[in-house]
Amino acid sequence: MVSTFITVAKTLLVALLFVNINIVVGTATTGKHCSTGPIECCKQVMDSKSPQATELLTKNGLGLGVLAGVKGLVGANCSPITAIGIGSGSQCSGQTVCCQNNNFNGVVAIGCTPINANV
């Protein structure tokens, strides 16, 4: 019974994520924000069609359906960049990006576009 619940929960999560991905369009930046939310700092970025992206999603329990129709990069270990000079989130030692969907608790962000945030 528990395994059935987990399977149903994963299926619903993938369906909701697919809807969110298709609703969000554009990743333009204005100031320190993207049109989709804060600028993110990802420790690693990869092509959404790469074996590394497939492995990252699979390893984190996400189905490949979350990439359906997604253009751009997949980010790994991402966090929002805060205002300059405030906390550890004010600097990025990885790649700064704007992502269409970063609702995976920082583990994965999809539909990312690299930017030069100068932070």
Swiss-Prot record:
Q: Name one GO cellular component term.
A: fungal-type cell wall
Similarity comment: Belongs to the fungal hydrophobin family.
Name the UniProt record assigns to this protein: Class I hydrophobin B
Pfam families hit by this protein: Hydrophobin
Q: Cite the InterPro entries for this sequence.
A: Hydrophobin, Hydrophobin_CS
Specify the signal sequence span.
1-26
Output the Gene Ontology terms for molecular function: structural constituent of cell wall
Keyword Signal among record annotations: yes
Keyword check for Disulfide bond, yes or no: yes
Q: Gene of origin?
A: hypB
Subcellular location(s) per record: Secreted; Secreted, Cell wall
Disulfide feature: C34-C98, C41-C92, C42-C78, C99-C112
Instruction: Explain the induction of this protein.
Output: The highest level of expressionoccurs early in development when the primordium differentiates into densely packed, randomly oriented cap hyphae and loosely packed, vertically oriented stipe hyphae. In mature mushrooms, transcripts accumulate only in the transitional zone between cap and stipe tissue.
Its biological purpose is as follows: Aerial growth, conidiation, and dispersal of filamentous fungi in the environment rely upon a capability of their secreting small amphipathic proteins called hydrophobins (HPBs) with low sequence identity. Class I can self-assemble into an outermost layer of rodlet bundles on aerial cell surfaces, conferring cellular hydrophobicity that supports fungal growth, development and dispersal; whereas Class II form highly ordered films at water-air interfaces through intermolecular interactions but contribute nothing to the rodlet structure.
Predominant location of this chain? secreted
Which keywords describe this protein according to UniProt?
Cell wall, Disulfide bond, Secreted, Signal
